[in-house]
Amino acid sequence: MGTGREVSTGSSDGPRRVAMTPAARRALAAAERLFYERGIHAVGVDLIAAEAGVTKKTLYDRFGSKEQIVVEYLADRDERWRAFLAERLDAVPAPRATPAARILAVFDASRAWMADHGSKGCSMVNAHAEISDPAHPAHAVITGQKRWMLELFTGLARDAGGIDPDAADRLGRTLMLLHEGALVAHGLKVFPDPLAHARDEARALLAGATGS
């Protein structure tokens, strides 16, 4: 990579995680599908157990509560997204792997992720609409991902060069807003391909900020 900036996929200080047995993994896969397609509040433990082919007792033995199932659902999806994004950024060809190119690659990665995993938009944004209480253990997963994305955009903006640190931080925040707004528009299906539109706007922002 041209910049040498490593994209960390780890999350720190997150909620407690559950050790996964095969039955727990089946339950988590069912919960992910149901929560994402129907919403967290609309899905009960009975339905998750039935879809996974496990008993309610098994669910409670493994997870302890529906709250913890929600935590595992979001944390698992977050981990997979971070790994996917890091892989996509690492794949930017070295001669072209400038910070600006990697910023645009974030939008490309989100577009690819949404094509395969995101018919209803961002799972974190959707979950936050249902779980706004900061005391809910899943809240840390949701905000943790968004803070991580902000740090990624800001770090790449600083690496782009040609602008002072304060301007780079503002650029990072603006790129974050573009990205998150496009995710919401994707879920709402307001207009076609909002992430491609956001990428074009990001390119224009970068050109204006760095003169390249």
Q: Where are these predicted regions, by residue range?
A:
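N-terminal intrinsically disordered/low-complexity leader segments
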Residues: M1-P22, T210-S212
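Amphipathic, non-transmembrane alpha-helical scaffold segments
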Residues: M20, L28, V70, L74, ...
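Generic hydrophobic, amphipathic alpha-helix propensity
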Residues: A23-E32, I48, Y73-W81, L85, ...
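Helix-turn-helix
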Residues: R26, A30-Q68, E72
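Hydrophobic alpha-helical connector segments
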Residues: E72, A86-D116, L171-L175
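Amphipathic alpha-helical packing segments from all-alpha helical-bundle domains
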Residues: E79-A86, A101-A105, K120, P134-D159, ...
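Amphipathic alpha-helical segments used for helix-helix packing
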Residues: D116-H136
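Hydrophobic/aromatic-rich alpha-helical bundle segments in the mid-to-C-terminal region
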Residues: P137-R147, D159-L205, A209-S212
